[in-house]
Amino acid sequence: MASLEIIKLEWATPIFKVVEHSQDGLYILLQGQISWQNSSQTYDLDEGNMLFLRRGSYAVRCGTKEPCQLLWIPLPGSFLSTFLHRFGSLLSEIRRDNATPKPLLIFNISPILSQSIQNLCAILERSDFPSVLTQLRIEELLLLLAFSSQGALFLSALRHLGNRPEERLQKFMEENYLQGWKLSKFAREFGMGLTTFKELFGTVYGISPRAWISERRILYAHQLLLNGKMSIVDIAMEAGFSSQSYFTQSYRRRFGCTPSQARLTKIATTG
């Protein structure tokens, strides 16, 4: 089993920035407050919360003046497959939830979870310990989450992660969301009929293809807006919007301000 690269992060971002994840994993908020957004919901985390997320792009903002401190635990497919196989008999005792897995799940950290996290952090500080100890601590953490009040939802998400058609769809959409195709063209290029494509998409993302594509383009445009000097009209075209006015309307609906206002806020914040 490959070693897992666990990272301790410190973020200071008072305005929403886009965070892209090519892997599924867990965030543990060690200090501060933070908000995560996907296309349909905002998730507010307080110190002591844990967040499970599926691969994808999200908008993130810190809610405190002090930097937020987080621990990122990636969960690659090979690790999860081994985990599910190893503890399959034990996990089969947990009620199955057949609902579409949520892209984000928030867990409140109980005393026993807190102790498990402390033990994991202690091992991470010891370079002389073998990596297998880290893996064992992560497995312990996953088991505790599986037997928590949201365990059925958590396991449902884990079981979907190793699904090859779903992984292929995620890769395909990340590579092609800027294409100006009709939905039937997306389905055809993926190698499916339109109805089957929509059904698979709903299973993976929990929203319609059009809503996901629109959200992904808005996040891409948001990155260009805050991290470059392109004009707003050029950003609109680059991100696949039919006009600047449509982009401005979509941006205001998503972030609560116009692109021009967001850029001015970024300049004022960074000096």
Swiss-Prot record:
Q: Which Pfam families match?
A: ExsA_N (PF22200), HTH_18 (PF12833)
Effect of altering residue 152 to T? In plasmid pYVa127/90
Q: Do you know which SUPFAM superfamilies this protein is assigned to? A: Homeodomain-like, Regulatory protein AraC
One MF term from GO for this chain?
sequence-specific DNA binding
Protein biosynthesis among the record's keywords? no
The record's PROSITE patterns line, in alphabetical order, gives: HTH_ARAC_FAMILY_1 (PS00041), HTH_ARAC_FAMILY_2 (PS01124)
Impact noted for substituting residue 228 to C: In plasmid pYVa127/90
| Expression induction | By increase in temperature.
Q: Where is the HTH araC/xylS-type domain?
A: 167-265
Indicate the residues that the entry says bind DNA. Answer: 184-205, 232-255
- Presence of the UniProt keyword Transcription in the record: yes
Q: Which keywords label this protein?
A: Activator, DNA-binding, Plasmid, Transcription, Transcription regulation, Virulence
Q: Which InterPro entries does the annotation name?
A: AraC_XylS_family_regulators (IPR050204), ExsA-like_N (IPR054015), Homeodomain-like_sf (IPR009057), HTH-like (IPR037923), HTH_AraC (IPR018060), HTH_AraC-typ_CS (IPR018062), Tscrpt_reg_AraC-type_HTH (IPR020449)
Cited function: Transcriptional activator of the Yersinia virulence regulon.
Indicate what this protein is called per its UniProt record.
Answer: Virulence regulon transcriptional activator VirF
Source organism phylogeny: Bacteria, Pseudomonadati, Pseudomonadota, Gammaproteobacteria, Enterobacterales
Gene expressing this chain: virF
